[in-house]
């Protein structure tokens, strides 16, 4: 893929990962788009905090525009948000982010969007996996140090932060949990399932069949997608069967397939082991147990709170709409139940819900989801600054980047 052009503010880096190349037996690469702060060249003495904005494969650093919206753009219509001219709105808010980013009172930080496409998906979920390889270690210990050195970042755990939505929301929380000392806070919006008792509409530990409710007299299909008034858009069976048509052995490029590739063990055929029979929906309890022990974030926090708790105090922030399109709010409720009852220490973070808000809601109680989803950076940068002010260790550089 030919990368987009660099600009004054946006740079591109690409490295060959030794860890991933060894795992795959051929050269494997990681890339990142880097958004530099205002005044980067004029302040060579400054060292910056680093923000990792996780999400799907970034063709470029989207949502950042140095000019007002194109006056000649033909307006489109967003069916999802019932919004005329949403393409113009997107450009408007990209320009507003540029104005915010360059304003005198905005804290100067570096933001990156990581490219970690792999043979199964456009994204690795930024953790180590039997099927995908050590993407978590490669990003945390190879790519990020390279970027920090190249772009004068502080390069310490207290000065690294994570945020993202949907896939990026799971990654933000998952990376914080698996690398608790390497990052100082995560802001996870509408995360993919963080408790597999609410794996969208399935409890993979107790349910027998993923496609139908466990009822003795009839087959009631489990939903997979809905709108914000609860109308079902498609079923889980339909979603999984579509992926079977698109590709074999978890190679459809679809959502269910990548979850199995990341969360599951290697199967007997060398491909990811299915969590359930894709034709019938019958759940494999052995695969489910592997998922629980290795990637069920709520379960892992409960199991390991004695060691993880002190390292994660104040670092976990989760946001979701209570009408998430893919039922992802249900797992957040279960996570909240755990975290609000933690002791020694209390988790001391934040969980918030958007009333009747759908997918991608990020904690903004003052704007509709159509707009708040375009303001992730403005939502979380002030929270990151507050976290630094509260938690930076004695002697830490909290001033060179405040110009």
Show the residue positions of the predicted features.
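Non-catalytic cap/lid and distal C-terminal segments of serine-dependent acyl enzymes
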Residues: 1-403
């Amino acid at each position: 893929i030919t990368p987009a052009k660099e600009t004054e503010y946006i740079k591109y880096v690409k490295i060959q990962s030794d860890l991933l190349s060894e795992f795959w037996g051929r050269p494997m690469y990681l890339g990142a788009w880097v958004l530099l702060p205002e005044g980067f060249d004029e302040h060579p003495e400054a060292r910056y905090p680093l923000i990792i904005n996780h999400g799907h494969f970034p063709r470029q650093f989207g949502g950042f525009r140095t000019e007002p919206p194109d006056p000649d753009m033909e307006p489109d219509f967003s069916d999802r948000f019932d919004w005329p001219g949403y393409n113009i709105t997107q450009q408007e808010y990209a320009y507003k982010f540029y104005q915010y980013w360059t304003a005198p009172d905005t804290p100067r930080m570096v933001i990156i969007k990581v490219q970690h496409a792999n043979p199964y998906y456009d994204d690795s979920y930024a953790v180590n996996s039997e099927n995908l390889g050590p993407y978590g270690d490669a990003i945390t210990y190879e790519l990020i140090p390279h970027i920090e050195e190249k772009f004068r970042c502080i390069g310490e755990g207290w000065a690294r932060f994570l945020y993202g939505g949907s896939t990026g929301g799971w990654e933000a929380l998952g990376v914080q949990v698996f690398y608790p000392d390497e990052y100082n806070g995560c802001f996870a919006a509408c995360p993919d399932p963080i408790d597999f008792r609410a794996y969208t509409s399935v409890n993979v530990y107790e349910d027998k069949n993923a496609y139908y409710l466990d009822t003795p007299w009839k087959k009631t299909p489990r939903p997979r997608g809905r709108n914000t008034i609860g109308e079902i858009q498609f079923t889980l069976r339909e979603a999984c069967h579509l992926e079977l048509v698109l590709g074999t052995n978890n190679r459809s490029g679809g959502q269910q397939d990548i979850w199995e590739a990341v969360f599951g063990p290697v199967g007997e055929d060398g491909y990811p082991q299915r969590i359930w029979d894709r034709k019938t929906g019958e759940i494999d309890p052995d695969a489910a147990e592997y998922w629980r022990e290795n990637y069920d974030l709520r379960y892992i926090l409960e199991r390991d709170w004695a060691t993880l708790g002190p390292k994660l105090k104040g670092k976990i922030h989760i946001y979701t709409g209570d009408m998430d399109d893919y039922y992802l709010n249900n797992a957040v409720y279960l996570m909240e139940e755990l975290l609000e009852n933690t002791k020694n220490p209390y988790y001391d973070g934040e969980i918030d819900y958007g009333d009747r808000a759908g997918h991608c809601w990020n904690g903004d109680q003052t704007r509709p989801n159509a707009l708040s989803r375009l303001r992730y950076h403005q939502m979380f940068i002030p929270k990151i600054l507050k976290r630094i002010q509260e938690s930076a260790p004695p002697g830490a550089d909290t001033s060179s980047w405040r110009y």
